[in-house]
């Protein structure tokens, strides 16, 4: 295909610690791409510091396009490789580096349906040792991506209107339900599914220290209900991440008011039922939080209680 400005392409690697709507971006890419921010009363101090940092210090800026006396931009931008002693004025345009939270349009080819391009929030990896995009593994099914060397493309929108449009229309958390199947397409996969089954088995017991430790990885948890010195079931810990007022009966599994009472959580329960009901009742944000919490909980619990595969399997 053709080459375009304000884009980046590199290999993707998995990261279960970032949210499904975040995209880990290497610092080298964040410094190469730029967003044109107009200088105003609200941001002149921040942008002045970025101009002082220049092109080679993050977070900095690459160019300054000064406003002319007739209040129109002169497109002869000043390259901050050669000049950093610039006094900003209201109306100037500073082409600053990519920052945490900036919307990024992310794409994997071949682009076969609308979810082949979705909007993520930038999460800058401030370490020169890493040079790949980081993607949550639960966000891979819509892209049909895996981590065996796939490359993906990022596109940085160049105005606030485009940022807003992407955030409203193409935000990945609003694409959790597939328009083709009307079922969740962004869901638990691989270790998260297996771990959800293991942690909700009847014989899983967790002491209060591990219970507290695992709870620190979760968002929106009430710590006051955890009693010191008491053992808890794995069902109790998993119940803490299920949204309130979710009621499910499926074969032997029973969830009442967000509390797992009987049975276990398998692939059907966690993906089709919990995520599906959460989407219908609470919408995108709470469903995104459940997926993030489930992934963090299971990933860290499996470090304590793993599993093995033998020849018999």
Predicted regions and their residues:
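Flexible, glycine-rich loop/tail regions that form catalytic "lids" or insertion modules at the edges
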Residues: 13-14, 22, 109-112, 136, ...
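Core mixed alpha/beta domains of very large multi-subunit molecular machines
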Residues: 1-176, 238, 242-244, 249, ...
């Amino acid at each position: 295909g053709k080459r375009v400005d304000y884009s980046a392409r590199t290999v993707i690697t998995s990261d279960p610690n970032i949210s499904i709507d975040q995209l880990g971006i290497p610092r080298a890419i964040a410094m190469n791409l730029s967003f044109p921010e107009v200088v105003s009363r609200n941001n002149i101090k921040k942008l002045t510091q970025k101009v002082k940092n220049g092109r080679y210090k993050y977070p900095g800026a690459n160019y300054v396009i000064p406003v002319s006396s007739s209040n129109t931009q002169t497109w002869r931008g000043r390259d901050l490789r050669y000049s950093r002693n610039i006094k900003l004025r209201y109306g100037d345009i500073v082409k600053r580096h990519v920052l945490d939270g900036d919307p990024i349009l992310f794409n994997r080819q071949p682009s076969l349906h609308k979810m082949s391009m979705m909007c993520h929030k930038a999460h800058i990896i401030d370490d020169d040792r890493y040079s790949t995009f980081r993607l949550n593994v639960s966000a891979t099914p819509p892209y049909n991506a895996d981590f065996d060397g796939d490359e993906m493309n990022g596109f940085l929108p160049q105005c606030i209107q485009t940022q807003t449009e992407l955030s409203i229309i193409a935000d990945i958390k609003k694409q959790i339900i597939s328009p083709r199947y009307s079922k969740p397409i962004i869901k638990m996969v691989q270790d998260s599914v297996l771990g959800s089954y293991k942690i909700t088995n009847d014989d899983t017991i967790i002491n209060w220290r591990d219970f507290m430790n695992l709870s620190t990885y979760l968002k929106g948890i009430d710590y006051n209900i955890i009693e010191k010195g008491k053992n808890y079931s794995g069902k109790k810990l998993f119940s803490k991440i299920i949204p309130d007022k979710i009621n499910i009966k499926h074969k032997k599994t029973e969830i009442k008011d967000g509390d797992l009472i009987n049975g276990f959580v398998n692939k059907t329960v966690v993906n089709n039922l919990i995520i599906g009901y959460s989407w219908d009742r609470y919408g995108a944000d709470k469903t995104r939080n459940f997926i993030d919490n489930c992934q963090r909980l299971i990933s860290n619990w499996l470090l304590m209680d793993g599993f093995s595969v033998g020849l018999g399997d």
